[in-house]
């Protein structure tokens, strides 16, 4: 699961909480996805200019009361982390990710897309949208961690109950064996240890879903394929909730003065 929104949320919040400076935060984001800039700004009242670098945009938003970044990881039928209106929700669902940005007097949304130019330039373009002034309905960290564990158990049982002939099935089964030994955390400094742990676990299980999906129907009966698909769907939903909860777990109530 390669996400452009997660690094912006993690490092943006680390900057807002005073744990890193603006330059360090933007550098960390761009190490993941290449140069980041604001794409075409719709013809509405939004505090962005088309084509400006991410660093410039964030500096301007700071002067407008920027106070939080929130991660959205929606899919069709599950608008996780979104608050509307329709235009923002549709764009984020199609991208399967987005960011809510809290300003002093409003909330705006950012939806990423690949910015490819020529044969070698690859970066990220952020399209801004108006967002409804509401809090997204997302789980807390403890709730999301527990749901992830339960979904893992269900998915492991579903895998064991089918005769999978896919060549990478052993890799999937090994990763379904437990939640220990996750990869590097996608979070930045300032997040609590539990959030880092949950993000690591969710990142590894996102890989399980990616490995298992291509073989969901090969060599299986209709019932087996349905069982496997449902287990993976629930695991994917739990992974997305865990990532959203982990990225929202930083304390922004006692901010230092972020570096410029």
Please report, for each region that a protein language model flagged, where it lies by residue.
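N-terminal intrinsically disordered, low-complexity regulatory tails that precede a folded domain
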Residues: 1-99
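Glutamate identity and glutamate-enriched acidic tracts
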Residues: 24, 30, 87, 94-97, ...
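Acidic-enriched, low-complexity/disordered segments with a strong bias for Aspartate over Glutamate
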Residues: 23, 27, 45, 49, ...
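Intrinsic-disorder-associated interaction segments
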Residues: 1-5, 9, 15-22, 30, ...
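Short, flexible coil/linker segments at or flanking structured domains
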Residues: 3, 87-89, 136, 147, ...
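Residue-identity detector for threonine
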Residues: 40, 56, 75, 127, ...
């Amino acid at each position: 699961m390669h996400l452009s929104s997660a690094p912006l949320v993690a490092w943006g919040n680390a900057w807002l909480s005073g744990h890193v400076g603006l330059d360090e935060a933007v550098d960390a984001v761009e190490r993941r996805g290449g140069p980041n800039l604001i794409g075409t700004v719709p013809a509405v009242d939004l505090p962005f200019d088309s084509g400006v670098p991410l660093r410039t945009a964030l500096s301007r938003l700071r002067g407008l009361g920027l106070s939080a970044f929130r991660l959205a990881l929606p899919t069709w039928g599950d608008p996780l982390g979104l608050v509307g209106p329709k235009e923002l929700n549709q764009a984020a669902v199609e991208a399967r990710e987005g960011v809510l940005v809290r300003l002093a007097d409003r909330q705006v949304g950012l939806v990423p897309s690949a910015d490819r130019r020529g044969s070698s330039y690859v970066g990220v373009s952020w399209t801004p949208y108006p967002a409804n002034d509401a809090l997204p309905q997302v789980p807390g960290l403890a709730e999301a961690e527990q749901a992830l564990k339960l979904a893992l158990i269900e998915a492991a049982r579903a895998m064991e109950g089918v005769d999978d002939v896919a060549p990478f099935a052993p890799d999937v089964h090994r990763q379904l064996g437990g939640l220990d030994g996750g990869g590097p955390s996608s979070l930045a400094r300032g997040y609590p240890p539990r959030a880092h742990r949950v993000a690591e676990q969710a990142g590894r299980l996102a890989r399980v879903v990616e490995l298992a999906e291509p073989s969901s129907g090969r060599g299986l009966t209709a019932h087996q394929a349905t069982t496997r698909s449902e287990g993976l769907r629930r695991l994917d939903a739990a992974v997305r909730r865990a990532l959203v909860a982990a990225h929202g777990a930083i304390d922004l109530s006692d901010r230092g003065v972020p570096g410029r």
